[in-house]
Regions:
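A general structural signal marking secondary-structure boundaries and capping sites
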Residues: 3-8, 65, 114-115
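Short linear functional motifs in flexible/disordered or boundary regions
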Residues: 8-12, 70-72, 88, 115
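Alpha/beta-hydrolase
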Residues: 1-52, 56
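Conserved loop-alpha-helix segment in the C-terminal half of the alpha/beta-hydrolase fold
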Residues: 41-91
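Short aromatic-enriched loop/helix-cap "lid" or pocket-rim segments at secondary-structure transitions
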Residues: 13, 73, 98-100
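Catalytic active-site module of serine/aspartate enzymes centered on a nucleophile-bearing elbow/loop
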Residues: 82-115
Length: 115
């Protein structure tokens, strides 16, 4: 959880505090039971080079303390034509929680450009 979000408390957004209603069967089938080493159905899946074929506006958002490391985010950014990448300092995977106002402003700006 340290790369996703800080510990939850009464001030955490409701969407994070509410009880999850979904299971993890599909995740375990696809990825496997180990978070850090894929051994499920997706273990040999690699879409990296196909990113060059994307023809839609793409916004890549990541945090400096994210499981999607800056290297991974930059790999996507370098391959998706015309992509934009925003790296949020001092943020984990849930940048919309860590820096909500900055995140919302970025989304509004980006959506206005492509809507």
């Amino acid at each position: 959880m340290r790369h996703c979000n800080s510990p939850l408390n009464e001030n955490s957004p409701e969407c994070l505090r509410r009880e999850a209603k979904i299971g993890n069967e599909s995740y375990i089938t696809a990825w496997g039971p180990n978070e850090f080493t894929p051994i499920g159905n997706l273990k040999d899946f690699n879409y990296t080079e196909k990113l060059r074929n994307w023809k839609v506006p793409s916004l890549i958002i990541s945090g400096t303390s994210d499981l999607c490391t800056p290297l991974l985010a930059k790999t996507m950014y370098d391959r998706i034509p015309g992509a934009r990448w925003e790296l949020f300092e001092d943020s984990k995977h849930l940048v919309y929680v860590d820096q909500n106002e900055k995140y919302i402003n970025l989304l509004i700006e980006w959506l206005n450009k492509y809507d």
